[in-house]
Amino acid sequence: MTIRKSNPYLSLVNSYLMDSPQPSSMNYWWNVGSLLGLCLVMQMASGMFLAMHYSSSMELAFNSVEHMMRDVNAGWLMRYIHANGASFFFMCLYLHMGKALYYGSYKSPRVLVWSMGVMMFMLTMATAFMGYCLVYGQMSHWGATVITNLLSAMPFMGGDLVPLSIILSLYLLYISLKTFMKMIFNQSYMCPAKGWVKKVLDNTFCIKKYMHMYLSSRTSPXLYINTMSNMQHMKIMSTKSHTKDRDTSFLEKDIKNMDRNLLALMVGFMDGDGYIRMNKKSKDNMNYIYMSLIMNLNKNDLKLLQYFHQQLNMGKVYNMTPKKGNKLARWEMNKLDLFNKMEPLLEYHNMKFLTETRQKQYLLLKYIKHNKLVYYEDIINNNNYINEFIENNTLMDNFIKLDYFNNWLVGFTMAEGSFLIKKNKDICFQLKQKYNLELFNNMTLFFNTTRKLNINKNKYMQFNVSSKNDIQNMINFFSFSNNQPLLGNKLISYNKWLFTIKNSMRYKELKTPYMSWHQKEQ
C-alpha cells in the first residue's frame, strides 16, 4: 500500500483530493470553483506585498505605485500578477456563474447557495472598483467618473445629481482613498470567510442530497446507488426528477398528536378491507421490492376514504374503473408511506393488525424495513429468518385484552360487518371473514354470546347473532359506549337497522338511542 494511503495524515488528504468518490455526472466545469480559490489566494498574497509599499495619500498614491515598479525588488512582477490575476479571477467567476446557470443551480433547493454566490459577486465587483481607483492616475479618475455618471440612470433627479457629483468627485476621491484601502483589506480577508460559508452551505447541501439518494435507494426503486465498492462509483439510475420532494416522514408531534381511538378504528378498517401487496418491480435489470397498502371500496365511500386520508396524510385517494365491475374508490399507500409514516405511527401507539393475513403482511413489511432489504431476491434468501420473525411476533390470542380492541372492532365492523334486515322484519348482525378462527372466538367472548361460529367449506368465519339479548349487546356497544362512532355508509345502515328495531313490536323492549329526524330520513 502506498504511503499516501497508509499514513494516517496523508490518507485524510488522499481521501479528499485524490481518491474522493464523486458522482459520474460531474465534468471539467466543476474545476472552475477550485480555480477561483487559487486566484483568490494569488490576489491575497500579491496584494499583501503591494500594500507594504503603497501610500494611501492623494499626493503620494501614484508615486508609490511607480516606486513599486522601479525600485522594489520584483515589484513589477507582484503588480502584474495582481492585475492579471484580477482579470483571470473574473474570467473564472463568470465561467463559474455560467456553469451554474446552465445546470440550473439557482433553482430549489439550492436557492440559498446561489444567493450567497450572488452576494459574493456583488462584493467582489465593489472591491475591484475600489482597487482600480487606488492608483489615482488618469484611468483611475475616469473610471471613477464613469461610475459617478451612473447616477444619471436614476429617474427625475439623476440629471441634477451628476454635475454635483462631478464637482465633488475629487474631494470624494481624496476622502475615500484611505477608506478604499481599508475596505479592500477588510474585503480581502473577509472574502475567504464568505467563501468558507458558501463552501459549508454547498457541502452541507451535497451531503444532505447524497444521504437522501442513499436512503432512497434502500426504500425506492426510483433511485439506485451502487454501494458495492464503498460508493466509489456513484450512479444515479433515474431519469425522472421532481422539483419538490415529497413529504416522506411524520414529525414527532404529528405522531404524538394523532387521535389514538381514531387510529385504532382506521387500523380495524384496513384490517378488514385493506391488503398489503408485495411484488417485484424490474428496472435496470434489477428486481426491486415494491410494496403498497390498497383499499378498494364502493364509489359511495369515496368521502370516507378522503376523510381517513386527511387524518393520516398518507398515499392518495382516487376513483378507478376496473375492466370488469363497477366504479371503485381506492386508497393507495406506497412503500415510502408505509415505511416512513404508517410503521412509526403504529409502533409509537403500540398497535398491530389483528387478522392473521394482515399481521403476516405487516410483519413482513417490518422485517424488510429494519433489515434494509432492497432486492426481491433478498426475500428468497432470507425466507427462513422471515418465517421465524413472523412466527415469533404474531399475536394469536387475548385480543380482547388490548386497550384499543373496542375501537378496532368498530373499524372492522365498518369493513366486514352487516346490519341485516330480513323480509319478515327480523334483524341480525353479521361479521364475516376468512382464516381468522381465533379472532372470531375472541369476538364471541367479547359480546358474551352463546352462538357458535359458522365455518363454510371455503374457511369463511361467520359471526352471526339475532337473539334479543345479543342485539341489545350490539346496540350497547355501538351506541352507549365511549367508542368511536361508525362512519360512512355503515352508519347509514346502522341507523336504518335501529329505525326498524324502534318500529318493531318484537323488539319494543330493547333500549335504543334517540334518533333525530335526519337519522330517520337516512
Curated annotation (Swiss-Prot):
Membrane topology, Mitochondrial matrix segments: 1-31, 106-110, 176-522
SUPFAM superfamilies for this protein: Homing endonucleases (SSF55608), Transmembrane di-heme cytochromes (SSF81342)
InterPro entries given in the database record: Cyt_b/b6_N, Cytb/b6-like_sf, Cytochrome_b_N_euk/bac, Di-haem_cyt_TM, Homing_endonucl, LAGLIDADG_dom
Stretches assigned to the Mitochondrial intermembrane side: 53-84, 132-154
CDD domains: Cytochrome_b_N
Cellular-component GO terms for this entry: mitochondrial inner membrane
UniProt entry tagged with the keyword Lyase: no
S-S bridge residues: none
Record's subcellular location: Mitochondrion inner membrane
Coiled coil: none
More details: Encoded from partially processed COB mRNA that terminates with the in-frame coding sequence of the third intron.
Function: Mitochondrial mRNA maturase required for splicing of intron 3 of the cytochrome b (COB) gene, containing its own coding sequence.
Family note: In the N-terminal section; belongs to the cytochrome b family. In the C-terminal section; belongs to the LAGLIDADG endonuclease family.
Name by which UniProt lists this protein: Cytochrome b mRNA maturase bI3
Organism field: Debaryomyces hansenii (strain ATCC 36239 / CBS 767 / BCRC 21394 / JCM 1990 / NBRC 0083 / IGC 2968) (Yeast)
